[in-house]
């Protein structure tokens, strides 16, 4: 009988959890509107999707929901290949650029592709949020829609590919016809590109065999025409030298301190302070403070800061050598779209050097589909054969390219034995090399105590490969360069950057940034206890939470218990913000407790945060009984799963229930936002 009651209890809890989820988590502090998304349609097109399709005579629509640029890149590449192989008139569209009132009127002679990523805890990407709301709550019949969906996700997350699966289900439920099978890719297993290629091949088979489209010989057809401008130089004011957008080129005429600031328009923030938190032979970590006092850029504790990157001098030199662009660095060119729906990806006219430094992802891994696409431009027949062979062999590509972490230039020069690829059109490079995207960091400051300053905490990424190459993080090494220069440490950086920026706009020590809202928030009720779990830089937003509660106490506000579980390798080497925690404890008193785990301090015993959680299970259970909210930040692949498993075991033990029931109960807390994660 007791088990029957327990089953009923779990069912009730899950029902309440679902209700809480759709109530938009009213008991939590809601993120402020920071103006992340712009409502302006890129390229000046109508926001009427049906009108745009008809006006431009398109019969294939590819919609992307992208947070880091991968889904957008896939949509663009798929569009080009569908057009080239089958002659379909394709159009790539950002969800954020259109309204959806008449989406159900799209006729059945138009094929619609959805390339959508899942972000955070099963949420749509920022640009797909409005469409997600429309599809979920407002869409009626979609009986004339012919669609297919590819979802991008990470299986280390609880809600793996939730948005792709949801879109596919809802589109069918509302009457849509799936013309090709749903597909999904898993970044957690490192097979995202391969999963996409497999799905793409299946779609092409469907287009040929079921829809009877005739396949043509694949050839490169540019969407843009490049014209060099001999009448312009780098000294001309209209020429872009890497500015984020045209507003920055016209900066003397426009007030750049006013938002909204978003993924199309950042704020150029001064870096007021940097300091090294630790340094070791393997890695180091920097603390960076951005001054936003001269702008209307706002954030709330728990949000993310997007930092806009540029490429290192070393990777630029290698890329320039690879494509034989040495004598074109300062040459100005202009792009003209050959398709009225194609969006030029950066301001122009612009220089070759500015594109390579500020707009292309030249430091990241190269994909197999890029290998196959560029093979036709190989410098000789032997290299073409090598490229085609490697590109068509998944295992050989994995062994020779992926596992060695070769970027575009590394891979091309490796396959050609150092011969430059001078015949590759720069239009091809612009269309096929992914574009640089902002990198996102959990904010480690409190908007209550630091209203005009945004802090981030970043581990500087440098990996030494067997062949002597250094694989470096783009933004983290840029921040390290700034820390070295700002503090005049005399340290030699692994790679070097142009810190002055286009037209010296980044002097002294400025970078483009914007804020991305997050649901990772402290409870509205300040007396609610919280359990914070964050090893390594996962402690960053949790530091912000603790600082928030410290400020609340200073303001005379009552706060609940705050328990922090923190882990690092060694107490003396990489203990982040070590001196600060005792200061916070002196203010919070009995309402603050910290447990530390050191994984490499004792050679005979590795201790992780989940071990400390288990060791203090009574503390955890008592707080949960008092309504505590759990916050986990850090590695999704192992730590977050191990922590969740440990919490479930604690619940099972102290509440005397079966572990599978405890697992379901903990999952229900996630839906209620009683168990929140900010993981990567």
Swiss-Prot record:
Domain of life: Eukaryota
Keyword Endoplasmic reticulum: yes
Sites where the protein binds NADP(+): 283, 537, 599-600, 606-610, 642
One example GO MF annotation: NADPH-hemoprotein reductase activity
E.C. numbers: 1.6.2.4
Annotated FMN binding sites: 66-71, 117-120, 152-161, 187
Catalytic activity line of the entry: 2 oxidized [cytochrome P450] + NADPH = 2 reduced [cytochrome P450] + NADP(+) + H(+)
Major subcellular site: endoplasmic reticulum
CDD domains: CYPOR
GO cellular component, one term: plasma membrane
Cofactor(s) for this UniProt protein: FAD; FMN
Pfam families: FAD_binding_1 (PF00667), Flavodoxin_1 (PF00258), NAD_binding_1 (PF00175)
Binding site for FAD: 439-442, 457-459, 473-476, 680
Subcellular location: Endoplasmic reticulum membrane; Mitochondrion outer membrane; Cell membrane
Class of the enzyme per the UniProt entry, highest EC level: oxidoreductase
Membrane-spanning segments: 6-23
Record's cofactor remark: Binds 1 FAD per monomer.
Residue ranges of domain FAD-binding FR-type in the record: 264-509
Membrane topology: Single-pass membrane protein
Cytoplasmic side, ranges: 24-680
Limits of the Flavodoxin-like domain: 60-204
Function noted in UniProt: This enzyme is required for electron transfer from NADP to cytochrome P450 in microsomes. It can also provide electron transfer to heme oxygenase and cytochrome B5. Involved in ergosterol biosynthesis.
Family recorded in the similarity comment: Belongs to the NADPH--cytochrome P450 reductase family.
Record-given protein name: NADPH--cytochrome P450 reductase
């Amino acid at each position: 009988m007791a088990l029957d009651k327990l089953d009923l209890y779990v069912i009730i809890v899950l029902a309440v959890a679902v209700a809480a989820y759709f109530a938009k988590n009213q008991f939590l502090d809601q993120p402020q509107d920071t103006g992340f998304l712009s409502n302006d349609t890129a390229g000046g097109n109508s926001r009427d999707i049906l009108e745009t399709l008809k006006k431009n005579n398109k019969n294939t629509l590819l919609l992307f929901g992208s947070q880091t640029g991968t889904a957008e890149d896939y949509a663009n590449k798929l569009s080009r290949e569908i057009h080239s192989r089958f002659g379909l008139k394709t159009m790539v569209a950002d969800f954020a650029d259109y309204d959806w009132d008449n989406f159900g009127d799209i006729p059945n002679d138009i094929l619609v592709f959805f390339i959508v990523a899942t972000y955070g805890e099963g949420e749509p990407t920022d640009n797909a949020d409005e469409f997600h709301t429309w599809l979920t709550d407002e869409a009626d019949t979609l009986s004339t829609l012919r669609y297919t969906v590819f979802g991008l996700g990470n299986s280390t997350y609880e809600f793996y590919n939730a948005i792709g699966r949801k879109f596919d289900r809802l589109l069918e439920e509302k009457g849509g016809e799936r013309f090709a099978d749903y597909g999904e890719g898993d970044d957690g297993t490192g097979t995202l590109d391969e999963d996409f290629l497999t799905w793409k091949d299946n779609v092409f088979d469907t287009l040929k065999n079921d829809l009877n489209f005739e396949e043509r010989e694949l050839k490169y057809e540019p969407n843009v025409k490049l014209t060099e401008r001999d009448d312009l130089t780098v000294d001309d004011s209209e020429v872009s030298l890497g500015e984020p957008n045209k507003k920055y080129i016209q900066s003397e005429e426009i007030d750049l301190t006013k938002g909204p600031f978003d993924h199309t328009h950042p704020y150029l923030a001064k870096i007021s302070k940097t300091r090294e938190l630790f340094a070791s032979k393997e890695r180091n970590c920097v603390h960076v403070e951005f001054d936003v006092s001269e702008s209307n850029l706002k954030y709330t504790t728990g949000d993310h800061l997007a930092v806009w990157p540029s490429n290192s001098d070393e990777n630029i030199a290698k890329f320039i050598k690879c494509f034989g662009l040495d004598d074109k660095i300062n040459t100005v060119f202009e792009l003209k779209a050959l398709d009225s729906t194609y969006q030029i990806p950066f301001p122009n006219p612009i220089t070759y050097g500015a594109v390579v430094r500020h707009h292309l992802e030249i430091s990241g891994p190269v994909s197999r589909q890029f290998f196959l696409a560029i093979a036709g431009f190989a410098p000789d027949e032997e290299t073409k054969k090598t490229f085609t062979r490697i590109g068509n062999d998944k295992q050989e590509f994995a062994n020779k390219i992926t596992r060695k972490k070769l970027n575009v230039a590394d891979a091309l020069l490796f396959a050609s034995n150092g011969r430059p690829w001078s015949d590759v059109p720069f239009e091809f490079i612009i269309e096929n090399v992914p574009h640089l995207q902002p990198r996102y960091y959990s904010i480690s400051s409190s908007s209550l105590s630091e209203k005009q300053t945004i802090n981030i905490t970043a581990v500087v990424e440098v990996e030494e490969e067997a062949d002597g190459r250094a694989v470096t993080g783009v933004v983290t090494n840029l921040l390290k360069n700034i820390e070295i220069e700002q503090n005049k440490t005399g340290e030699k950086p692994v790679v070097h950057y142009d810190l002055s920026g286009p037209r010296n706009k980044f002097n002294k020590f400025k970078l483009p940034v914007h804020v991305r809202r997050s649901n990772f928030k402290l409870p509205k009720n300040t007396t609610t206890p919280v359990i914070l779990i964050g090893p390594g830089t996962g402690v960053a937003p949790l530091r912000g939470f603790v600082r928030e509660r410290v400020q609340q106490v200073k303001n005379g506000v009552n706060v609940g218990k705050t328990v922090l579980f923190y882990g690092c390798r060694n107490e003396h080497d990489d203990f982040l913000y070590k001196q600060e925690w005792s200061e916070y404890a002196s203010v919070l008193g009995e309402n603050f407790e910290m447990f530390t785990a050191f994984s490499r301090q004792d050679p005979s015993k590795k201790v992780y945060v989940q071990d400390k959680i288990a060791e203090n299970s009574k503390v955890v259970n008592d707080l949960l009984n008092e309504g505590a909210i759990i916050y986990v930040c850090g590695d999704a692949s192992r730590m977050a799963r191990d922590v969740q498993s440990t919490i479930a075991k604690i619940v099972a033990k102290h509440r005397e229930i079966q572990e599978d029931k405890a697992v379901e109960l903990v999952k229900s807390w996630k839906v209620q936002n009683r168990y929140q994660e900010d993981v990567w």
